């Protein structure tokens, strides 16, 4: 259904299902500092020679930031790469959990607890702080990290069920998996897709699965 017409005769959609995927959402305050080596280079010609001058600088950066609702899926059944790639969700649309939203859709219970998932959230936050510190250094030919110190203080965690559409398809004898954000329609997968087909299909099924279910902890 989602593949371009050229692929239609060579693939078979095995399954499409709507799933409420368990997620842990982490809030935290983070601070970071780093020491970086930056260089600038300039060249000029002197007779038959080209002389290049490289200058080295020690650059220090420090900053703080706040993370709200960093999501980590708590189901080993779901591929982490797909779940990360279909972000973000609009948490302003959260609704208190109610079984009234579940008929017709699968709802997984987490099999990875908050402590296990916090390790992934921690890595994501650290990488984000590190990237922001490095990105703040501009105007140099090159920048390399000498040392960084990043501290993360967790302030809250939340448990939520977030809507995902999963599509399993077979093409040329191989199985492929697509995932779609059930709120925004963002689609990730391995094969080329016809975005017009995706948009048309999503328009028909998105409304009943746009509920984000939150558990108060």
Where do the protein language model's features map onto the residues?
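Juxtamembrane boundary at the C-terminal end of a transmembrane helix
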Residues: 211-217
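Juxtamembrane/start-of-transmembrane alpha-helix segments at the extracytoplasmic/lumenal side
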Residues: 190-202
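Bilayer-spanning, highly hydrophobic alpha-helical transmembrane segments
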Residues: 202-209
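Flexible loop/turn segments at secondary-structure boundaries
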Residues: 33-35, 174-175, 186, 196
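Short coil/turn linker and secondary-structure boundary residues
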Residues: 7-11, 180, 193
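Charged, low-complexity helical/coil segments in non-catalytic cytosolic or luminal regions
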Residues: 1-170
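Extended, hydrophilic extramembrane loops/domains of integral membrane proteins
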Residues: 162-191
């Amino acid at each position: 259904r989602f593949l371009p017409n050229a692929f239609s005769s060579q693939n078979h959609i095995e399954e499409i299902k709507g799933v409420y995927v368990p997620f842990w959402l982490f809030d935290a305050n983070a601070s970071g500092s780093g020491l970086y080596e930056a260089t600038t280079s300039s060249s000029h010609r002197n007779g038959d020679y080209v002389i290049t001058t490289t200058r080295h600088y020690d650059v220090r950066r420090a900053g703080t930031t706040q993370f709200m609702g960093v999501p980590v899926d708590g189901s080993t059944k779901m591929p982490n790469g797909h779940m990360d790639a279909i972000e973000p969700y609009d948490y302003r649309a959260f609704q208190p959990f109610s079984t009234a939203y579940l008929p017709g859709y699968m709802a997984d219970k987490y099999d990875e607890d908050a402590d296990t998932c916090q390790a992934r959230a921690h890595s994501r936050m650290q990488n984000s702080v590190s990237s922001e510190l490095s990105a703040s250094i501009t105007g140099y030919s090159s920048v390399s990290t000498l040392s960084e110190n990043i501290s993360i203080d967790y302030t809250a965690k939340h448990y939520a069920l977030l809507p995902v559409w999963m599509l399993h398809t077979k093409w040329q004898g191989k199985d492929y998996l697509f995932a779609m954000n059930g709120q925004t329609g963002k689609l990730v997968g391995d094969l080329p897709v016809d975005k017009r087909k995706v948009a048309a299909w999503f328009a028909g099924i998105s409304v009943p699965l746009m509920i984000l279910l939150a558990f108060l902890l």
